[in-house]
């Protein structure tokens, strides 16, 4: 389903693993060069600065082309303009497929920009050709192409868009069921976020879905944030008051407020504790960030101190928390340490041996097993830090 060449994607991961191993002095330069020659990558993926430049250039060209189109159909009706916009989005999509299939672009900035503009013009075109669409309809309209683009291109932004629009479908569909549904909405969103977190954690371990690992990681972070936001007192009170017209007065609480205060205070602590227990840096860092949300929420409704003192107190709490976590992890506890590896990519890459074995079994003709790489005198394959 994914548009990029599978073999090149696998070889890219292997090469990145080899570079990480080289930086950690686990293999020699000759061995790293041998891996690179044995597993060539036929993809164009420039560095970050060139990628940003190509993205901006593609955006300018795409918008200029659309501007010329607008001048040509200036006197057309809104529906005709929508049809032309839809055609233009399909042209952009065709260009995207061409750049990937023929020019071998992979996260070069050009394909990233074309993905965004293609889905953007598609959604705009449907809105122009249709009567006003409800929030539920908009969520469905965005989810369908975003999910397709996620499967087709493994794009991180499309993963986030598909996930959020799916939650939008649930949200706007569920609140139509009445007041009880509105009251239960925070708990439903928390449940969905928790289920999403468990599923993407399982998906990251599935070798068949290895090319979507970055998407899984992004959804994992989003699900943790949404789980907390759906249980945060400030978010629940203000969103409910705004969307459901509760007409709450200043100082007036929502029903069951104590439940959300408990979630507000305990979830970040739970994130931090579980992050330490599971050696999960995403849980740990998210929990540390959410400590600031606790301070903000408490300060917003309870003016126990001037703003400057409250902010200083919150900062001191976060610094002390980070300090004690650092001290706890020095020396390393149970294979978990505060120290950064030489190459951060080691935390997110797949197991090299698994990929080599997979490629070996996918060969049309059987090949003789090769001798493992020599790491400092011992034989065996390098393993990344992936659990």
Name each model feature, range by range.
Residues 2-387:
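Alpha-helical multi-pass membrane segments and their bilayer interfacial helix-loop junctions
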């Amino acid at each position: 389903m994914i548009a990029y060449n599978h073999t090149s994607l696998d070889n890219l991961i292997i090469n990145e693993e080899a570079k990480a191993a080289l930086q950690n002095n686990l293999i020699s330069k000759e061995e790293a060069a041998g891996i690179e020659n044995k597993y060539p990558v036929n993809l164009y993926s420039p560095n970050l600065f060139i990628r940003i430049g190509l993205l901006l250039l593609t955006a300018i060209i795409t918008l200029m082309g659309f501007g010329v189109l607008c001048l040509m159909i200036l006197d057309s009706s809104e529906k005709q303009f929508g049809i032309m916009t839809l055609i233009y989005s399909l042209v952009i999509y065709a260009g995207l497929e061409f750049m990937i299939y023929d020019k071998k672009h992979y996260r070069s900035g050009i394909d990233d920009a074309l993905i965004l503009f293609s889905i953007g013009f598609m959604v705009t075109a449907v809105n122009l050709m249709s009567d006003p669409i409800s929030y539920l309809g908009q969520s469905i309209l965005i989810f369908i192409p975003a999910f397709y683009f996620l499967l087709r291109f493994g794009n991180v932004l499309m993963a986030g868009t598909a996930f959020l629009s799916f939650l939008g479908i649930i949200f706007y569909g569920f609140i139509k069921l009445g007041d009880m549904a509105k009251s239960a909405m925070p708990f439903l969103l928390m449940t969905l976020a928790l289920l999403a977190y468990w599923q993407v954690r399982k998906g990251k371990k599935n070798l068949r879905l290895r090319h979507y690992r970055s998407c899984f990681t992004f959804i994992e972070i989003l699900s943790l944030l949404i789980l907390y936001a759906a249980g945060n007192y400030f978010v629940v009170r203000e969103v409910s008051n705004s969307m459901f017209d509760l007409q709450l007065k200043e100082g007036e609480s929502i029903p069951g407020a104590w439940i959300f205060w408990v979630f507000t205070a305990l979830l970040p602590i739970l994130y931090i504790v579980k992050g330490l227990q599971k050696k999960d840096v995403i849980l740990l860092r998210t929990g540390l960030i959410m400590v600031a949300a606790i301070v903000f929420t408490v300060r917003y409704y309870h003016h126990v101190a001037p703003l400057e003192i409250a902010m200083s107190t919150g900062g001191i709490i976060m610094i002390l928390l980070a300090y004690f976590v650092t001290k706890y992890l020095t020396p390393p506890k149970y294979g978990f340490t505060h120290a950064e590896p030489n190459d951060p990519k080691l935390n997110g890459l797949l197991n090299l041996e698994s990929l080599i074995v997979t490629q070996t079994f996918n060969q049309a003709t059987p090949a003789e097993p090769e001798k493992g790489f020599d790491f400092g005198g011992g034989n065996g394959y390098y393993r990344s830090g992936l659990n």
